[in-house]
């Protein structure tokens, strides 16, 4: 974000930023500065017309809360979170709740070791086919 003086502000809270943007079908966030963001909860909540989203350029190293981030994005088909750094995330509940059209989801760098709340992450993601390429047993 740019403030009145023309310099970039250090945003920490992006919660509800695009929530209920029902007419939004696509969005280019490739140049969004997210390096200081801590909270992304409900960010795309109820964006029911959103079809595809690429957040691979998001810097999420400080994010702790992503609960309900894509809640009820019922038209979302493709989502790229391939570089999403989730090592500090503690709240992940309902992350993809009711993303019933989602068929392509890249979570290749997700780390859930610090997550404390993770219920219903994929609730009603009926179109999503899970393919586990590698299962690691750390017993």
Predicted regions and their residues:
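Negatively charged
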Residues: 1-139
